[in-house]
Amino acid sequence: SMLSNNILVADGAFPGDDFCIQMEGGVLDSDYNNLVARNGAWIGNREGNWERLLYWQRASGEDVHSLSHDPLFADEAGWDLHLKSSTGRYLNGVWTNDGAGNHSPAIDAGVPWFSHTNEPSPNGGRVNIGAYGNTPQASKSRTNAWLLAMTMNDGGVLKGTNNLLRWSAGNLGTTDLVRIEYSANGGPWTTVANNLSAVPGEYVWDTTTCTSSLQVLWRVVLQTNAAVQD
């Protein structure tokens, strides 16, 4: 089975809603989703139950380009699953803006080669994840440069020499450069690597050279404008 461009939210507060992906058998091809586990729910099961996207990726080999971010639905409790957008969201036949701090990470995060031509402009040149991707009601894209850190957004542990960090980018190209930074305690930031291409958005991190901590954070920063970061 193929599973892509979906937002799957599992909430352990509701009986029977314990997994974003619960495998009973067969073959799964899953990627470019947004998987969110709340209140003790699990991302997926493969040789065990996995509460973090990173652990599910390692155990299953699936969802390597997927997210685990708050999808920022317009009104989740009211079942309005349009994505909040700083540039335009469909609401009862008209368009509204949600402000700069309310832009869904699922916008422009779908399968890169899937069609997006039914989405209104600006559409970022990439389909949105979720129910309204590639439809006239798709939430609109940002027109400024942006970065989104993907790896470990929902937590987890990285150790050793071969840890792949992933991020996504918009309105940036291969000549735009970024740097990777980390903080051991949420305080000062230390540069791990610089002069990396903003796209395709991957870096192998050797964590043995860094201070070990349970509070480590990492971020990706645009070198020409440090305000563009995540």
Kindly give the residue locations of the regions a language model identified:
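Extracellular beta-rich repeat passengers
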Residues: 1-64
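Extracellular carbohydrate recognition
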Residues: 27, 119-124, 227-230
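Flexible loop/turn segments at secondary-structure boundaries
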Residues: 42, 80-81, 139, 189
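Extracytoplasmic/periplasmic beta-strand context in beta-sandwich domains
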Residues: 17-19, 71, 127, 178, ...
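C-terminal accessory segments
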Residues: 34-37, 55-138
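Low-complexity, Ser/Thr/Pro-rich intrinsically disordered linker/stalk segments at domain junctions
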Residues: 143-230
